[in-house]
């Protein structure tokens, strides 16, 4: 796997500048979260590098690699189906910073909403999500994700 890591913001953002880069990162997250919420395990895992690390407090240890990411999505789907709920993730207050090595460092709030069949939605969790994004073949991929929950802080 070859990962592109330009050193300058101009190389990352292109002629349109940081605003265009920011919009592309928002679009990446919108796509990634919709894959996750629709339980498209393979599609979601493909938005991560092959050797990605995914750390969330609901798991005993970080997930490493795409096969583990696929298994995590399938496990979440079973839990939601058994519980009769649909979960939706909303990403906001996104901060994007560039590293000297061309890696994007992002930090945002992730709100998880749960909706029971036939019931009202409720806010299930408030989290902070911190990622390292790298480019591979012109597309952004998550290399590392750490999620923390406000209720466990």
Where are these regions (language model features)?
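Short, low-complexity N-terminal intrinsically disordered segments enriched in polar/charged residues
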Residues: 1-38, 42-46
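A beta-strand edge to alpha-helix "cap/lid" segment located at domain peripheries
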Residues: 2-13, 79-153
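A structural signal for alpha-helical segments
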Residues: 16, 20, 61-64, 121
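Residue-level detector of alpha-helix boundaries and kinks
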Residues: 16-17, 29, 54, 81, ...
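A generic "alpha-helical surface" signal
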Residues: 23-27, 67, 124
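K/E-rich alpha-helical interaction surfaces of small helical-bundle regulatory domains
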Residues: 33-49, 134-138, 143, 148
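A solvent-exposed, acidic/Ser-Thr-rich amphipathic alpha-helical stretch
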Residues: 41-109
């Amino acid at each position: 796997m070859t990962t592109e890591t330009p050193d300058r913001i101009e190389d990352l953002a292109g002629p349109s500048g940081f605003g265009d880069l920011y919009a592309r990162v928002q679009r990446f997250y919108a796509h990634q979260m919709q894959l996750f919420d629709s339980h498209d395990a393979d599609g979601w895992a493909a938005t991560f590098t092959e050797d990605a690390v995914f750390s969330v407090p609901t798991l005993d240890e970080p997930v490493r690699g795409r096969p583990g990411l696929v298994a995590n999505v399938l496990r979440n789907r079973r839990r939601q189906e058994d519980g009769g709920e649909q979960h939706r993730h909303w990403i906001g207050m996104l901060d994007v910073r560039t590293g000297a090595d061309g890696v994007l460092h992002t930090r945002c709030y992730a709100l998880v909403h749960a909706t029971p069949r036939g019931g009202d939605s409720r806010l299930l969790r408030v989290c902070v999500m911190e990622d390292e994004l790298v480019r591979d073949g012109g597309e952004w991929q998550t290399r590392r994700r750490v999620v923390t929950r406000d209720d466990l802080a």
